Amino acid sequence: MSVRVRLAPSPTGNLHIGTARTAVFNWLYARRHGGQFILRIEDTDRERSSPRYTRNILAGLAWLGLDWDEGPIYQSNRIARYQAVVQQLLDQGLAYRCYVSEVELEAMRAAQKAAGKAPRYDNRHRFLTEEQRRAYEAEGRQPVIRFKIEEPLEVSWVDLIRGPITWNTQDLGGDMVIARADGYPLYNLAVVVDDIDMGITHVIRGEDHIGNTPKQILLYRALGHEPPQFAHSPLILNPEGKKLSKRDGATSVAEFQQMGFLPEALKNYLALLSWSPPDGEEIFSLEKAATMFDFDRVNRAAARFDWNKLNWINSQYIKQLSPAELVERLTPFWQAAGFDLGSVPDPTWLEEVACLIAEGIDRLTEAPPLSRFLFQEPLSYSLPALEQLRLPGVAEAMAAMATTLAAAELPQPVSADSLKPLVEEVAKSQGMKKGLLLKSLRAALTGDLQGPDLMASFALLQRRGWALGRLEAVQKVVA
């Protein structure tokens, strides 16, 4: 039997990080077993579904590189199929028309709450006579369709992550609605029909769906099909153990992309949320993970989102990029910061800038502020940098550095090593400690006291033709 799994997001919001983790698990399991990964868009909620959310979901999955084998299949294109199944269940006496109004349902729930009971539908319209049905219809009532749930009955399955689970039908809230009054199907019915028609063998989803599973198993049986195997992965919580929310920084894949995370790093981290590879490695491609993925190594406990770990993983992937790849990934962020990339000396210069700052960043968004001094002229100075330049003897030392630089015959292209003797010469001629000179040189060239490697930065600025001017500008800056 070929493994067939599916990801079935609802386009009622952007691609959530929890859905992305579910997508990763489905993709890994399908690839591990040489199966198929199907994408289904569950867009039957006409009030909340939106094409822009569908586009966001598709774009997010594509950015992550989670390729699907079939789909996207849209539930909204299959309404007639669901309605035919509803009619089949009605014809078989397994479902019925329920005319209970919303007001009556609210009164029923209020009475149950007052009696200390859990709210549930009391199946009051399961055995209506034809005369009673006609009377309700004469009132203008439009019925929903409810599926009969026999009670008491135990529904059991062996969850591939959580082990044996048993649910009593008395805890399912009574006969469930499977179609609205307008004929549109509800979630549990549409999901079961789709999974049957698409030959889904394994349903891998979040544990928040466990309560739907017994209802769906009953529908599978009513339709004459064996249910697929289920695997319910633990939820993703914030570092404090609470539900992940906007307050935690980001919840959608698009936000992580905008924050400067690489898709390879985010996939890697999502795979590690509740799962661990047998070799204990933390940096791996999804293709490698697919050779090791197994539900036996998925933890049942809720996963806590660890920003520090994600940042570290992302930094490792940034360091692995080639110079050309670094430039490609950084370009959108540089452009968003307003940097003119067309005015740089040459492509090699841009690659060297990328490699220089890659060592000091966890996210791509950190690159523009760290490299701003290499792209923007005139230079702006931080207050600590100005204070450094105003120290006794510093302005004179920078003037000497400018004179020495202007007179030097430097090999082309200028390198950090070719500039180091000039620094030694000025430190000696000015009687200044090298540490003080270097700190002052950083302030003069970069406008700050912290940043990437100073001599490499010096060389890049010299190749751009900006180093001499910045050294000469110190006298005016401190005046």
Swiss-Prot record:
Location of the motif 'HIGH' region: 9-19
Gene Ontology cellular-component annotations: cytosol
Residues reported in the UniProt entry to bind ATP: K246
GO biological process, one term: glutamyl-tRNA aminoacylation
Main location: cytoplasm
Record keywords: Aminoacyl-tRNA synthetase, ATP-binding, Cytoplasm, Ligase, Nucleotide-binding, Protein biosynthesis
Encoding gene per record: gltX
Record-linked Gene3D superfamilies: 1.10.10.350, Glutamate-tRNA synthetase, class I, anticodon-binding domain 1 (1.10.8.70), HUPs (3.40.50.620)
Record's subcellular location: Cytoplasm
Reactions the enzyme catalyzes: tRNA(Glu) + L-glutamate + ATP = L-glutamyl-tRNA(Glu) + AMP + diphosphate
Protein name: Glutamate--tRNA ligase
